[in-house]
Amino acid sequence: MSKGVFITATGTDVGKTYISALLVKKLKQQGINAGYYKAALSGGVMIDGNIVAKDAEYVLKMSKIDKNPNDYVSYIFKLSASPHLAAQFENTEILMSKIVNDFEGIKNEFDYVTIEGSGGIICPIFIGEKPIMLIDIIKQLNLDIIIVSNSELGTINSTMLTVEYAKQNHINIKAIILNNFDSNNIIHIDNKRVIKELSRLTVYTCGTNVKDCEISLEDILNFYTDV
């Protein structure tokens, strides 16, 4: 049976892809059959007339997985916007059944799967007759989550709102990771302390350098549960 964890965040561009790549890379370095999946990606880049899932490409390159990144994303859109708007712009219906089927295939390929979300935890994936929110995907795939937050001023509010939303939706939170953490910044240091105290969760930090991430292999393995 495969194991998985879902990487969500307090918003866009706080480091979900970087953290996903870091986890997959560390597992791969230990000889573990680890892989990646993302249900919907917007902001795909056109290269030689073909759209490329850049987030997936980054993760696969960083973790040295020599595969086509597009094979690990169910829906890829060119418009850099929320998936629901990108799908509407390209007249595409996003189906939960495809996401589930694609994830089943990924599970058969890898022993450990890191699943990256889109935007923040309250992200509309598809608005239509059968609307899909990001939380619906997390529940459907039966995954625990890691919340990635920025370390800057204001992160206490955004992080705790994300924590409370997940709890209200009965989603299990494995940990919080503060990204772009500066161990010499008094605000960053206090943010970690306060978030840990308020959330009662384990709070890890990652700096701009991979070596500055304080997450051990044992901790990483504990993030993943049977799926």
From Swiss-Prot:
InterPro entries found in the cross-reference section: DTB_synth_BioD, P-loop_NTPase
Binding site for substrate: S42
Catalytic reaction annotation: (7R,8S)-7,8-diammoniononanoate + CO2 + ATP = (4R,5S)-dethiobiotin + ADP + phosphate + 3 H(+)
Pathway stated in the Swiss-Prot or TrEMBL entry: Cofactor biosynthesis; biotin biosynthesis; biotin from 7,8-diaminononanoate: step 1/2
Amino-acid positions noted as binding Mg(2+) in the UniProt annotation, renumbered to this chain: T17, D55, E116
GO cellular component: cytosol
Sample GO molecular function, one term: ATP binding
UniProt enzyme class: ligase
Subunit and interaction comment: Homodimer.
Family as reported in the entry's similarity comment: Belongs to the dethiobiotin synthetase family.
Function statement: Catalyzes a mechanistically unusual reaction, the ATP-dependent insertion of CO2 between the N7 and N8 nitrogen atoms of 7,8-diaminopelargonic acid (DAPA, also called 7,8-diammoniononanoate) to form a ureido ring.
Name the record gives this protein: ATP-dependent dethiobiotin synthetase BioD
Organism: Clostridium tetani (strain Massachusetts / E88)
